[in-house]
């Protein structure tokens, strides 16, 4: 407690001893932040011969600095690392964060790859679930090109037992095809049907489905986008012969 005396004024300023700072850890991520606080209250006592004593409290602005440890700064930009409180700030992507012209393109060869495992990998990249900035309600994903769609494989007896149904909308307009029949007629539709079932149903799902490009044969017209090989982590995606 510091006391400053003058002829008619006494100012009391409460201050805490400057310490090295108190560490607090995020309950979700477990990282540590250092918070340093400064004195925040000033009490003034003004003496007047006619009116007696008058007490006034003045609040000083508090400055809290959150510092990210040096071994954790690689995860953040310079502005985020030196910002006030990055742990309690909700981040939401802006329009400039998901521009279609800035999104990557991937290409994958469907030869002898299991249909379901291939479709789930493609759907994850189209939705952007492989990104740290994944947001369920925003189109954050990449574009995926599938070539050799006629060579996709299925396990077990699905080639003859798996059925695809479509209806023309008229009475008796139901058409049923097996996997083998549809693969011989329109092989691209098999991959499109599998991936579309793994995307959201609604306006966002329809927009995400446009990121899928399926072609019969090894060629595709997207060389200008310079597509990269689709990273596949599933070791069982290839058909075991």
UniProtKB/Swiss-Prot annotation:
It is found in: Plastid, Chloroplast. GO terms for molecular function: mRNA binding; structural constituent of ribosome. The keyword Ribosomal protein applies. GO terms for biological process: translation. The keyword Secreted does not apply. Its main location: plastid. Belongs to the universal ribosomal protein uL13 family. HAMAP family: Ribosomal_uL13. PANTHER family: LARGE RIBOSOMAL SUBUNIT PROTEIN UL13M, RIBOSOMAL PROTEIN L13. This is Large ribosomal subunit protein uL13c. The gene is RPL13.
């Amino acid at each position: 407690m510091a006391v400053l005396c003058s002829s008619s004024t006494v100012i009391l300023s409460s201050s805490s001893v400057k310490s090295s700072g108190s560490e607090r850890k995020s309950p979700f991520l477990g990282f540590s932040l250092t918070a340093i606080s400064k004195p925040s209250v000033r009490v003034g006592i003004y003496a007047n011969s006619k009116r007696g004593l008058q007490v006034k409290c003045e609040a000083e602005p508090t400055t809290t600095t959150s510092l990210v440890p040096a071994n954790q700064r690689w995860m953040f930009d310079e502005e985020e690392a030196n910002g006030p409180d990055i742990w309690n700030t909700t981040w939401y992507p802006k329009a400039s964060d998901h521009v279609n012209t800035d999104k990557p393109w991937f290409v994958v060869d469907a030869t002898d790859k299991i249909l379901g495992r291939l479709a789930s990998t493609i759907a994850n990249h189209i939705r952007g679930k492989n990104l740290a900035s994944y947001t369920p309600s925003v189109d954050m994903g990449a574009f995926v090109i599938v070539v050799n769609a006629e060579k996709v494989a299925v396990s077990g007896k699905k080639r003859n037992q798996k059925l695809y149904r479509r209806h023309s909308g008229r009475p008796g307009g139901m058409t049923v095809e097996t996997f083998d029949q549809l693969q011989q007629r329109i092989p691209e539709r098999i991959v499109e049907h599998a991936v579309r079932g793994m995307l959201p149903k609604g306006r966002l799902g329809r927009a995400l489905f446009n990121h899928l490009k399926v072609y019969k044969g090894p060629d595709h017209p997207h060389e200008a986008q310079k597509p990269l090989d689709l990273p596949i982590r599933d070791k069982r995606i290839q058909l075991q012969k």
